[in-house]
Amino acid sequence: MMAAASDSCLSLWEGSASSPNRQLTPEAVNCLTEALTEDVAVLRLIRSDPRVKIFMAVSVLTPRLARFAPPPPKLTHTAKCAVIMIYLTRPKALALQPKQFHMLVTFNKASVYSLVVRVKTKPFPVGTQRFRAVFQDPESIGLPSDIPDPAAENIPTEINDRLDVSNFATPAQPPKDKYDCCVLAPGVWWSNANKAIYFLQMDVALLALCPAGWKARGLGIILGRLLNHQEGCATCRFTEHSDPLNATADSVATPESCLCWAPCLWRKAHQRELTVEGDRYLFRVLFMDAVERVRLTGLRRSPKITANLADLVVGIGPHGQQIPVNNAGWKLVALDADISRLIVCGCYALRYICPPTNSKHQPSSPDEYA
């Protein structure tokens, strides 16, 4: 059996944290359900039978999620994410209303919380047995005498679903609040108003000019391949990711699955004029002629979401002359809120930049969630 709580949760409980009948405070139970709704992108269904539904989720920690996660034994990159198990049941003794469930939530196989909550779900647009969930109207309830052990559950280990953001990008115009944004990478923005990612995407026809097998079309990723130094470093190697889609703390994702990829000297040293050190042939998808250096503009100060490639990059030729950009080959696209949340919840860099919303989730239409 699993330990029911850790000493770090003392402030979460009404009364003593060691009491067998302890319950979350009203403030804590509301914080928990808001965190599970807003800071977790997707639930993976592990088991479903007439008695119980079991879901698993993985997300980079936010301040809300961190309140409920136990202290990590080691400060590794996986210690920055929460591994969550959710058990939904409908005990007759609780006389629950329709769509109400008794819910046990475990964090990192160590801390467990009990509540009654209204649950609404809808299929997630990527993969099978994946769901987006909204948790509402929570009520704290005492822990049951028999607490399930997540380690005893048969967790699927196959990684059978991958995210290619190009498949979910739709043509867009700069939003009305185009200045209300933060820069995630060159040509990639988080819209604070829409809670969604916008980015400049290369036309699919230009893939023919890229290295064999290349799929990524985001501007930041292309610039990274063009400008990153050959010997590489941790920033170049696309580390520090988890995999919320497959509910695993370690990710084997490729750059096209996350839009954080960018020239490493821009990210870690804030350099804006960079020498071409990577795949020099990629200049053909960005500029009308060969370039020796690339200047990144309009990124850190007064950023705005723009559809114009020339607002973001300047090519400099071998004699110091400016090289025109291939503006026709790039279009502004947007990801919907669910896909944007999935990317952010799996990336340590983006989670730090994109603050989780503090507002309670309201479905855009009554039929959005079942």
UniProtKB/Swiss-Prot annotation:
Q: Pfam families, alphabetically?
A: Herpes_UL16
Q: Which GO terms describe its cellular component?
A: host cell cytoplasm; host cell nucleus; viral tegument
Q: What is its main location?
A: virion
This protein's source sits in the domain of life called Viruses
> What are the subcellular locations of this protein?
Virion tegument; Host cytoplasm; Host nucleus
Q: Which residues cross the membrane?
A: none
Its keywords, alphabetically, are: Host cytoplasm, Host nucleus, Late protein, Virion, Virion tegument
What is the purpose of this protein? Answer: Plays a critical role in cytoplasmic virus egress. Participates in the final step of tegumentation and envelope acquisition within the host cytoplasm by directly interacting with the capsid. Upon virion binding to target cell, a signaling cascade is triggered to disrupt the interaction with the capsid, thereby preparing capsid uncoating.
Membership in a protein family = Belongs to the herpesviridae cytoplasmic envelopment protein 2 family.
| Known partners and oligomeric status | Interacts with cytoplasmic envelopment protein 3 and with the capsid.
Under which name does UniProt file this protein?
Cytoplasmic envelopment protein 2
Species of the source: Equine herpesvirus 1 (strain V592)
